[in-house]
Amino acid sequence: MIAGLDIKELVELALLLIAVGALSGFLAGVFGIGGGAILVPVFYECFRIAGVPLDVRMPLCVGTSLAVIIPTSIRSFQAHYKRGAVDMTILRVWWLPIVIGVVAGSVIARYAPERLFKIVFVAVAYSASARLIFGRDSWTLGDDLPQGPLMRIYGFCVGILSTLMGIGGGLFSNLLMTFYGRPIHQAVATSSALAVLISIPGALGYIYAGWPAAATYPGVSALQIPFALGYVSLIGAVLVMPMSLVTAPLGVRAAHAMSKRTLEVAFGCYLFLVGSRFVMSLAGGQ
């Protein structure tokens, strides 16, 4: 037995993570997200079953999710870039404030209580769910993205919130760009590039933030802290990454070939369910 699990249970967990990798990669391509909205709740359940201590469980999920997003987002960005759909002007304005936001989020992760990660995830999941399910073309903030300080503030907020949630930023940047009248396909493509900017420094930040936690739990068994770099689980990342790389280009192909309304509603419902799961976790302390 490993981490209190028999071989059958370990195999089931491994197969679940592989399947989730395929789904997260596909969604990374379709929505321009890194897949963290799928990965974080599944990692949470897997780490709970494996007996990871509650104090480090949520940040370990977030850090591992950001690590998985690195290759997935790069693959997705390359596919969108080849189609000429990425708005490089937005990237030039946003890259620095996003990176600063990621660094700030990583510092918060080192000292924040575990509940904070869940609260941020719930708030954003519910907001994005409402936008995806009930959103209308008339829901706008302006005819085009703002210039000057407000645009950079948006970038900073995307960076810090994405880092605390363990996502690639696509949920935020998609919402912002479409609220300002940008075509959904351009928003998706540009978001895939932002996920690269967020995931690399974000994962490194969680490795740094989680280093003290690894020393705090020296007796935790094999599937848990010893097979992690800080708040990044190597086992979780290795199981999820390969399939996510395979399916990301398939998601890009689907994004440019189909109506997104059905997928938007389905994903919005999923986010609502995930948010509700973490609400119950906050209430019950599990």
Segments (PLM) and residue ranges:
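Juxtamembrane transmembrane-helix boundary motif
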Residues: 1-31, 38-59, 73-165, 175-186, ...
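A structural-propensity feature for long, helix-poor, extended segments
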Residues: 65-72
